[in-house]
């Protein structure tokens, strides 16, 4: 009920933390509020959006596993993930799955962290100028979710940065550091400005 009510209130113009309580960061609630504003409020709007997020998670997981495994093995591992975690009900309350999660911050966070893993892998193996900025942005978006995803994103990014530092002879390019910092701080700055005006 909380996920539906909060998104509905935000779609009607309420401000999170002022007009309606929120337990976690604002990103997921405002994404859901935007969906309700566009498609109208309703459980099935969130279910379809959640299934799209789940499809993104499955694709990201498969592609990530594919980097180290054969296609059949990566597909089998992704299928196990789908069967065990996708639509399971381990309690009488059916809200601990991807179609109707207890907190959308979990599903959105998982997708962001998997996308971050792809970007960091690319930064390590096929560096592009946009990798550090995008990695910072994805890590910065996790700051607007739940703490466990913030820790995961920062640990992964820190490890990748450390590895990049040592593999480049003990130095990082200033442009990479600045791009990462800009991406990392942008979501929080935008959130602070938004809530400061409301």
Residue ranges and their predicted role:
Residues 108-134, 161-171:
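Membrane-interface transmembrane helices that cradle and orient dolichyl/undecaprenyl
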């Amino acid at each position: 009920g909380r996920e539906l009510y909060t998104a509905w209130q935000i779609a009607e113009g309420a401000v999170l933390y002022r007009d309606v309580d929120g337990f976690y960061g604002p990103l997921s609630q405002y994404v859901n509020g935007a969906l309700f504003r566009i498609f109208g409020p309703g459980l099935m709007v969130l279910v379809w959006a959640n299934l799209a997020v789940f499809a993104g998670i499955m694709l990201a997981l498969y592609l990530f596993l594919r980097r180290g495994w054969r296609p059949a093995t990566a597909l089998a591992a992704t299928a196990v993930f789908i069967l065990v975690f996708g639509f399971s009900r381990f309690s009488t309350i059916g809200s601990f799955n991807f179609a109707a999660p207890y907190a959308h911050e979990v599903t959105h966070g998982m997708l962001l962290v998997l996308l971050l893993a792809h970007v960091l892998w690319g930064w390590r193996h096929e560096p592009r100028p946009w990798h550090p900025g995008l990695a910072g942005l994805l890590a910065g978006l996790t700051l607007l979710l739940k703490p466990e995803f913030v820790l995961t994103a920062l640990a992964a990014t820190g490890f990748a940065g450390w590895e990049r530092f040592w593999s480049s002879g003990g130095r990082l390019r200033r442009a990479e550091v600045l791009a990462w910092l800009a991406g990392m701080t942008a979501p929080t700055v935008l959130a602070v400005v938004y809530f400061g005006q409301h």
